Amino acid sequence: MTIFKAASPEGTRDKLFAECLRLRGIRSSLMELFSSRSYKEIMTPELEYYDLFVRAENPLPQETMFKLVDRSGRLLVMRPDCTAPIARLVASHFKDAEGPFRLCYDETVFRSAAGLDGADSELPQCGVELIGAPGLRGDIEIVSLAVDAVRSAGLRDFRLELGHADFFFGLTEELGLSREDEEALRACIESRSFALLDELVAGYSGEAAQCLRRLPYLFGGPEILDEAAALTSNPRALAAVERLRDIWRELVSAGRGDCISFDLGLVQGLDYYTGVIFRCWTPGAPSSVLAGGRYDRLLCDFGLELAGAGFAVYVGALASCFECPEPEAAKTLIFYESGCLAEAVALLGGGAELSCFATEAESLEYARRAGMKLLVVSKNGIKEVDPNV
């Protein structure tokens, strides 16, 4: 039997100094931004009941979840998503409170990456959830904060793509598609499988079918909204276009329009989202660095009629966009005599470290090998010793 003692599990890896500094810096910048916008940090357990993630609206396949059993035989999972646990938290702790609730988090989700070479199973995320703000202003707040979040991490070359779930659902509703056909159509659009898309829509005629055929091509600048509106007279789809236009106008007036584009074929996770959808891309990142949207039905599962919107920043993907130098090695070694620890500790900082050697001579030899200067702290004071003399 192979003993896996010196290796980390598939989808996980050790992270060393420079990467840790980069990740910590991004997380700190994001959480500081969220706090400045009155979002309050919460934490949910890394272990949750499996039942929380198997609702009809849940887009996460159960095979991606890490499962285990508690001592009572109940099925648990390592948290594969942050939004559903936060919905549970709101229902448990704020059921009788008046919203809106502005919540933020810095947590890790766990998803099996089996079969995906190099993919991570541990995914650090920082994100926000705005609960109880159903209208346009809630959408604007979340989308503008998403732009500011990416900028606060130091990224300048990025595109935030906006879409809307109701554009797709308005068209499929008009055609009277079954849930199975709707999901098959969504998968084709997501994967840009144009031939299969034509095949699925071939049995339908009319304006809605033609518009669905065009859906994978409806991406670009604000002119795409005009093109989309010209393709359909469906009220639900047109309302979605107008909502995107309203968000766009406000972002432009706030100086955040230069990084915005539109993708009406943005249909990932449509079982989850009910309104605006967005994700952020940047050159050099292996995947999107941020994703979010509106999910007004999620809280209904917990008996609350509250709208929700939010996003998650994928910290690992974002960190891969930056170079981070290795932390500098200590330049000063401090040897202290017995009874002088307090004085020695007061000298730490700025690239100094305490000597672990028992004698000044051993400390001097180590400092020579490491190219450090040596400070000796005694009851007579502090002296600097040149290791090379």
Summary of predicted features, one role per range:
Residues 67-78, 187-190, 378-389:
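Short, basic, helix/turn surface patches
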Residues 44-62, 163-173, 266-274, 362-365:
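Beta-rich nucleic-acid/ligand-interaction surfaces
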Residues 1-84, 140, 161:
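TRNA-binding/sensing appendages of the translation machinery
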Residues 64-70, 176-199, 256:
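Acidic, His- and aromatic-enriched active-site or binding-groove loops in soluble protein domains
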Residues 19-37, 48-49, 83-95, 103-155, ...:
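Positively charged, Gly/Ser-enriched RNA/tRNA-binding surfaces
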Residues 145-152, 166-176:
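Hydrophobic mid-domain F-helix/FG-region of cytochrome P450s
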Residues 152-160, 165-168, 181, 195:
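Extended alpha-helical scaffolds
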